[in-house]
Amino acid sequence: MSNIIKQLEQEQMKQDVPSFRPGDTVEVKVWVVEGSKKRLQAFEGVVIAIRNRGLHSAFTVRKISNGEGVERVFQTHSPVVDSIAVKRRGAVRKAKLYYLRERTGKSARIKERLN
């Protein structure tokens, strides 16, 4: 029974997901429904956490909008997520960057990874 579930989950997983890590700046394009209209909305920010669970994988993106911190959790293989583009690679040494929540301005910057 477990093999059947794994096989079904494997079929539903997206194959075109780029590799990114915490600290990377990504742009996620999401389908938004407003009334009868359907359009793409971009959300660009720093990946602060990744949760790898196969089909149920998710990642958290944080950005500053109008001086207010905004975090959004995206399901990696969701049909609502249209595309993920890596804009900048960040050099960090932690898997979860929750410490960025308390930081603002220059102290919240992340160095760029060269390789």
UniProtKB/Swiss-Prot annotation:
Concerning InterPro entries, the annotation shows: Ribosomal_bL19, Ribosomal_bL19_CS, Ribosomal_bL19_sf, Translation_prot_SH3-like_sf
Q: Which UniProt keywords apply?
A: Ribonucleoprotein, Ribosomal protein
Say yes or no: keyword Transferase present. no
Matches recorded under Pfam families: Ribosomal_L19
UniProt GO MF annotations: structural constituent of ribosome
Could you tell me which SUPFAM superfamilies the record lists for this protein? Answer: Translation proteins SH3-like domain
> What are its GO cellular component terms?
cytosolic large ribosomal subunit
Segments crossing the lipid bilayer: none
Annotated GO biological process: translation
Q: What does this protein do?
A: This protein is located at the 30S-50S ribosomal subunit interface and may play a role in the structure and function of the aminoacyl-tRNA binding site.
- What family does the entry list? Belongs to the bacterial ribosomal protein bL19 family.
Protein name as it appears in the record: Large ribosomal subunit protein bL19
